[in-house]
Amino acid sequence: MKGKEYFEKLMFTYASQDVPLLFDFNVVIANLNKVSSNEAIKLIAQLRESIKISAKANEDYAIQYATIPLVGRTIFEQQKLLYNSLLQWLDSFEAQMSKE
């Protein structure tokens, strides 16, 4: 198989796959009920801070590489939306957890 043909096959393979959304921090979330409430609050706060730091880094990269083609810029936009969604989800989760 030649280079371009192999490249196109790879592109179609990845475009046709399930889109996994597995985050390493889900291990922390899944085990928060095994630590004290105080510790859980600290872990949630640390997770929020980590997401904010990652979002800021993504924003900085988007500014730094603002002149790249749309296909690259749109990845920064996608990541921005994901970080914002994660922060909203974390707020909701924390509110629900505080009621339990």
Predicted stretch roles:
Residues 12, 27-100:
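C-terminal regulatory/oligomerization modules of transcriptional regulators
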Residues 13-24:
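A eukaryote-biased feature capturing mid-to-C-terminal, repeat/solenoid-rich segments of large proteins
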Residues 1-8:
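Basic, amphipathic "hinge/linker" alpha-helix immediately C-terminal to the N-terminal HTH DNA-binding motif
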